[in-house]
Regions:
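Active-site segment flanking the S-adenosylmethionine/decSAM binding pocket
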Residues: 1-45
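Rossmann-like AdoMet/SAM-dependent catalytic core
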Residues: 31-125
Length: 125
């Protein structure tokens, strides 16, 4: 799903019975740099929580065309493609820590963006 910012409301309006039929979901989430905005954060959190009820995020690939923002010391891709797999199809193999993945390719040939470590590392260490 790549619908330029409308993904959040689309997910929220989708009945759970339909969402759980998807074994694999790939969504490009836009406007992630707005996560510090309370209203947007609540919308995004509700959308992610709905997906994560029955799916697990197995990969995140930043869109380098959109760039990255640094807010309060946190690097946030402005748009990123998330891949989810339904939990009944997934065996937890532990976190991936090698990025970019060999199958990742930049959207454009300049200004590469690698997933910032804070998105996959254990910050409680």
């Amino acid at each position: 799903m790549d619908i330029e910012g409308h993904e959040y409301l689309s997910i929220l309006s989708m009945p759970d019975a339909i969402l759980t039929k998807f074994r694999i979901i790939v969504i490009e989430f836009h406007y992630l740099e707005k996560l510090w905005n309370k209203e947007f954060f609540n919308l995004a959190a509700e959308s992610f929580n709905k997906i994560l009820t029955n799916h697990t995020c197995i990969h995140i690939h930043p869109n380098n065309l959109c760039g990255i923002s640094r807010i309060r010391g946190v690097e946030i891709p402005k748009a990123a493609e998330f891949t989810f797999i339904r939990n009944d199809r997934f065996k937890n193999m532990g976190p991936q820590t090698n990025f970019p993945h060999p199958l990742d390719f930049d959207n454009i040939s300049k200004n590469a963006v690698i997933l910032p470590e804070c998105w996959f590392s254990n910050l409680s260490k």
